[in-house]
């Protein structure tokens, strides 16, 4: 994601995990993007930085449990689905869906229900991130962000300094206008 606090814009990009890209440690040899994770967060950041020719200053990493915890701590999120589909015991409609953490995780993980598989899953993950951003920027959440973050301790890892989080929260409370969130999904075929 690229976040511009001055223009209140967020750019989200989904890159399929099975894309073959040069890893930052591979001397130009291509491997699946997902394999960058084997070498740690710095290799992931450097590989994405090389791929898109952008500087990546911070990371935010969580696992499935952390994702569920965050969505539940927010009181659920609203996601907009491109399709009506089912995933396990959950059904989703085309359009707006109100989801708790477990349902949001099912929404984000499903790929077999779609002709485009992992590509649609990536789009659904972007929709969930939008839902989280929209919810976390609500004044009711921001007024208690410190206790919110404390309650979620251990649910995620980030290199974003607490001071920067505080600045962003104060700016959002001062100017409660919505953020412009744009998302793109990379597409393509192999050589």
List each language-model region with its residue ranges.
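Non-catalytic, solvent-exposed segments at the cell envelope interface
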Residues: 1-191
